[in-house]
Amino acid sequence: MRGGGRFSIIIFALIGLAIYYFSNQEVNPFTGEREFNTVSIEKATQLGAQSYAQMLQQEGGNVVCSRAAGTCSAAGRELVATVREIGERLRIAAIDYERELLEAGWSFEPVSHKFDWTFNVIDSEQPNAFCLPGGYVAIYTGILDVTGNSDGQVTLADIKDVDKLAVVMGHEIGHAMAHHGAKRMSNTQLAQFGSMAVAVGLGDMSVSQQNMVRQAFGMAAQGGLMAFSRDHETQADKIGLELLVRACYDPREAPELWERMGQLGGGQRPPEWMSTHPASETRAANFREWMPAAVAMYKARCEQLN
């Protein structure tokens, strides 16, 4: 194909991508910004349910107090009950938060009341937690020492003070409320379409030139996706804080939690711009910035803080 014809195809492809991008925008009520999304709530929830079922099957006996586990100790029952109690309070808070946004004039489709809220605990040293689209939540026991007394071992003492665990769970639920999983899939798909458009224009180039262009586009796309991911993490932190206060958990525990998270792995991590998550120090600083408003709301809704 001649260069002019190939160039025209690239231009039309880029115009098509731009039209596709701007015609699939929705307002994020938690930020007020328009964001790209092509995956419906129903589709995302279906995928979330499938992924969650696969995860539970893979974990098998590691799912605390499940049928696959066979037995359920008193400690296991207390742990699962605590997680589910926190989850129920955050579920109610999520519904209330969306209702308040609608009453404030935001136009969006609330999702929290539609979710199939499910909370399970996974016996694993991995310090992790997640909430898939549809409200499917998993808490790994490895996170409990970070949210608990931070003494290097996981015991029931780690769930006596539930506020930091509520911070983690509120953050993960915030991802689901803001459709971050769907938006991540949408942006990945957009990057793939862009890669296809770039590939059309490589035919007349040498192999070395093609490799350079592919590498440059790949780095740019990856950098863009990482930036989206960091932004989503910050959004989920803010939404989680809103849920935390509405559920009457102490918001002041959040900064210390992220300081502890920053110490995992000896504090070694890549630069923030090369990561999908903001630095723990950045997150702790964000929470301190948001804290006066959160404390004021807590006092108005709940009780006086010590």
Describe the function of each predicted region.
Residues 160, 164, 185, 189, ...:
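Alpha-helix N-cap and coil->helix boundary residues
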Residues 237, 250, 255-306:
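Extracytoplasmic and endomembrane cell-envelope/extracellular-matrix remodeling and assembly machinery
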Residues 53, 88, 167, 192-195, ...:
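Generic alpha-helical structural context detector
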Residues 2, 14, 19-189, 202, ...:
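Peri-catalytic and regulatory segments of divalent metal-dependent proteins
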Residues 1-11:
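N-terminal Sec-pathway targeting helices
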